[in-house]
A protein has these predicted regions:
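Charged, glycine-rich active-site and insertion segments that engage polyanionic ligands
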Residues: 1-93, 104-113, 117-173
């Protein structure tokens, strides 16, 4: 279904403003049911965004900095205390966040719908660190972590490993 039709339906039937309807229609990728699901989801995105920003900042600082590695380990322990479903949703959110940064880095602004709400974090400043040389490895790392968490792996170990790998990958040229 074209984005315009989904956008109109969301505005007319669910009384959304144009910007919100446009964002949801874009995220739904032509699937009206997905747009409705996104509309009624439980609002984890802001919390996920805050966790993501803390994680990425710690990973960025961790290269050659033992104190920042401790921050990554603490972050991993905090996320590991959540339920598996929430961990999986968070990792899916991270994959999409990295995808949005890559699209922005490759000048595909019309496909970017993320607008970070965390103070002093701009997608435009983050995007240059996500590029063709590291996106596949980042995606594979996050997908593998998602798989292992689904299979009841130890979340603390999995997330610590992903964090250390992210530190290496985010600095890759």
């Amino acid at each position: 279904v074209p984005e315009e039709i989904i956008m109109d339906a969301l505005q007319n039937q669910h009384k959304l403003d144009q910007k919100s309807a446009q964002n949801l229609a874009h995220q739904a990728q032509g699937n009206y049911n997905k747009a409705l699901h996104l509309l009624h989801q439980d609002g984890d995105d802001l919390v996920f965004e805050e966790w993501f920003v803390v994680w990425v900042r710690a990973a960025f600082k961790a290269k050659g900095n033992a104190a920042a590695i401790q921050d990554l380990i603490q972050w991993s322990e905090q996320i590991a205390q959540l339920g598996r479903e929430k961990q999986k949703k968070f990792l899916e959110y991270c994959i999409e966040f990295f995808r949005q940064a890559l699209l922005l880095n490759y000048q595909a602004q019309q496909l970017v719908y993320f607008e970070p709400k965390v103070e002093k974090f701009k997608l435009e400043n983050f995007a240059p660190f996500i590029h063709g040389n590291n996106i596949n490895a980042i995606f594979t790392t996050l997908s593998d972590a998602l798989y292992h968490i689904e299979r009841n792996g130890n979340a603390k170990i999995i997330l610590t490993d992903v964090s250390i790998q992210l530190t290496r990958l985010i600095h890759k040229k």
